[in-house]
């Protein structure tokens, strides 16, 4: 509400300023130019000055195809209020401006550049196009960054504004989502998971939140690094707490969601994890990502899975912790099919590959490595031993049952064929228990894997239905889940508790709808950049042709999957219609998915965001007091 009011005032002020603002002049600057007649770098034709000569028949074109730009040094900071552009006069020109980004900066290397505008339509040759800019920061340098593979090829640019240092009271976003802006030294594109590229990273929220710091950037992930839309890991120079994230930390991840055309499967799984009451659920927020001025798409800014009081909250080991109770923890590891590609890893006695995440590979001591390998093998021996079902000496002795089984249920509800391909676990200091979690990696979950599609047509659990597993994990889970007669009772109890805590199709479908609305502008930009809605990517079983169809199927899947799980676990769900006898009824969930009210009349609600169901109709409500 406050931000909407501010925008109305800002727009009114901006419209008054336009009458006074004129076209700005400055020193043209840009990437090296190309001479198309020779294919070589040019210092005589297609120069940056050609984009500011008032002649729509001339043009600027860069030698390199991507991450190239042309702009002005204005001499002093100016608040930019309007921008104009015209595409190169040739057969390809109109399309070359689409997804170009207008940026402003106060460093001549543009390391502190922020996006002012993104062009979303083709241009018209021989015609100037204009857009109003709403940004309170004054910038000395302005530039047009051409879209990928376009060589800029711009006929004319014009910037309007007035001299002022401005302030940061309003910084624009491209779609209504927060933005992560990465500028790397010399515009080097991150190219592998090993080499950290010197960077400057800014995170701009929709309510004025702002983070800026030196950082390094590299690729992250495994199979996802092969996609054209790359995933990234950011490491800030100092600990940062961006947006509404709980953790203050240096390391953050940008998940690319290339094969997930809803762009929200991971976020949905995180929400389900919260409904199950997992000790820690990773933070996730949909964001737009800009790399060196180029729009990269809709991503999710997420926690790095690491030891932190607001992430995996265990003691952080020192290299002096080599004996006694200090040697017992904390440890964080990943059962990992790719473990043999890592430095700090082991293969268990029953062929389960494990990557040790904490202590770090360059800090862990021989004593610590031996301790956690021995402890894992002891737990595994209980699972595969003759007394595995014994309440005292069986698998429960060293493996925490509740977190392992909740992790299992989240994997099954989501239909995640990769549940046991990668499993995070941790051990606390002074405790003889291994805890499972957090949940992670759901790009191919929710019926997005051709190997198991359609999941709901199968009679058995998805982990037994052609999914992938690291080493011998499938047999490990079989022994815990199927061979111990007491386990199923425990699974039913945990499922029932989650169902009573708000895990139902009404809430989850309403949550999906609210996310789709929040991400609508961003998803349009994303699929403008990555034209894949009509093609099968990664493990897609079906190409549904539109974002709306992808979201609709996600809701259809979750509705049927909850019904499937109820039947499989023989759980009878009591709906609100069964407990409210009046002709009208309300059910209210809070932002975490917890039912806070159900009854015949709507109560007065405290400030916050709620999902309200009234006689079967669901809406999202914001109470702002």
Task: Annotate each predicted stretch with a short phrase.
Residues 79-91, 144:
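A short beta-strand element within beta-rich, extracytoplasmic domains
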Residues 202-256:
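Conserved oxyanion/phosphate-binding beta-strand-loop segments in alpha/beta enzyme cores
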Residues 177, 188-190, 211-215, 221-223, ...:
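Middle-to-C-terminal accessory/interaction subdomains
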Residues 577-625:
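C-terminal outer-membrane/trafficking sorting elements
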Residues 4-13:
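Sec-dependent N-terminal signal peptides
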Residues 64-68, 91-164:
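Trp- and acidic/polar-enriched beta-sheet ligand-binding modules for extracellular glycan
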Residues 20-75, 88-95, 121, 163-167:
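Disordered, acidic Ser/Thr/Pro-rich linker "stalks" and the adjacent N-terminal cap
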């Amino acid at each position: 509400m406050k931000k909407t009011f501010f925008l109305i005032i800002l727009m009114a002020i901006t419209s008054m300023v336009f009458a006074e603002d004129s076209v700005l002049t400055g020193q043209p600057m840009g990437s090296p130019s190309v001479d198309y007649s020779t294919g070589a770098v040019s210092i005589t034709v297609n120069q940056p000055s050609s984009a500011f000569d008032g002649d729509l028949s001339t043009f600027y074109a860069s030698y390199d195809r991507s991450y190239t730009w042309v702009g002005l040094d204005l001499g002093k900071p100016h608040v930019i209020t309007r921008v104009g552009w015209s595409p190169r006069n040739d057969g390809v020109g109109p399309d070359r401006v689409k997804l170009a980004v207008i940026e402003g900066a106060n460093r001549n290397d543009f390391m502190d550049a922020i996006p002012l505008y993104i062009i979303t339509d083709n241009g018209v040759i021989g015609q100037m196009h204009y857009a109003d800019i709403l940004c309170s920061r004054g910038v000395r340098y302005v530039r047009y960054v051409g879209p990928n593979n376009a060589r800029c090829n711009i006929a004319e640019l014009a910037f309007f504004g007035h001299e002022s240092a401005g302030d940061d009271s309003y910084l624009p976003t491209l779609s209504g989502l927060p933005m992560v802006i990465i500028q790397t030294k010399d515009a080097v594109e991150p190219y592998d998971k090993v080499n950290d590229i010197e960077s400057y990273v800014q995170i701009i929220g929709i309510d004025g939140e702002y983070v800026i710091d030196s950082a390094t950037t590299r690729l992250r992930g495994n199979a996802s690094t092969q996609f054209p839309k790359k995933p990234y890991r950011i490491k800030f120079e100092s600990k940062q707490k961006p947006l509404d994230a709980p953790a203050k930390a240096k390391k953050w991840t940008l998940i690319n969601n290339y094969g997930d055309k809803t762009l929200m499967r991971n976020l949905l799984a995180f929400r389900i994890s919260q409904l199950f009451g997992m000790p820690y659920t990773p933070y996730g927020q949909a964001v737009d990502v800009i790399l060196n001025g180029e729009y990269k798409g809709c991503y999710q800014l997420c926690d790095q899975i690491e030891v932190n009081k607001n992430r995996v909250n265990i003691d952080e080991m020192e290299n002096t912790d080599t004996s006694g109770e200090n040697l017992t923890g904390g440890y964080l590891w990943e059962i990992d099919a790719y473990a043999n590609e890592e430095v700090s890893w082991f293969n268990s006695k029953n062929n389960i590959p494990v990557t040790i995440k904490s202590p770090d590979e360059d800090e862990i001591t021989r004593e610590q490595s031996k301790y956690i390998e021995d402890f894992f093998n002891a737990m595994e021996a209980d699972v595969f031993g003759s007394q595995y079902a014994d309440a005292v000496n069986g698998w429960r002795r060293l493996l925490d049952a509740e977190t392992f089984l909740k992790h299992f249920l989240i994997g099954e509800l989501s239909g995640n064929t990769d549940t046991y391909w990668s499993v995070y676990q941790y051990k606390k200091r002074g405790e003889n228990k291994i805890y499972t979690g957090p949940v992670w990696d759901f790009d191919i979950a929710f019926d997005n894997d051709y190997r198991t599609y359609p999941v709901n047509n199968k009679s058995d659990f998805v982990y037994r239905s052609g999914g992938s597993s690291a080493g011998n994990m499938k047999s490990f889970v079989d022994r815990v889940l199927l061979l111990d007669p007491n386990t199923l009772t425990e699974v039913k109890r945990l499922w029932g508790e989650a169902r009573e805590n708000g895990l139902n199709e009404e809430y989850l479908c309403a949550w999906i709808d609210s996310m789709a609305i929040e991400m609508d502008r961003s998803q349009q930009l994303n699929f403008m950049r990555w034209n894949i809605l009509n093609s099968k990517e990664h493990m897609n079983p079906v190409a549904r042709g539109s974002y709306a169809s992808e979201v609709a199927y996600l809701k259809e899947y979750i509705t049927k999957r909850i019904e499937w799980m109820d039947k499989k676990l023989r759980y009878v769900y009591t709906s609100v219609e069964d407990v409210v006898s009046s002709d009208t009824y309300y059910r209210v969930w809070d932002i975490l998915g917890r039912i806070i009210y159900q009854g015949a009349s709507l109560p007065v609600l405290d400030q916050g965001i709620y999902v309200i169901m009234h006689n079967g109709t669901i809406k999202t409500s914001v109470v702002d007091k």
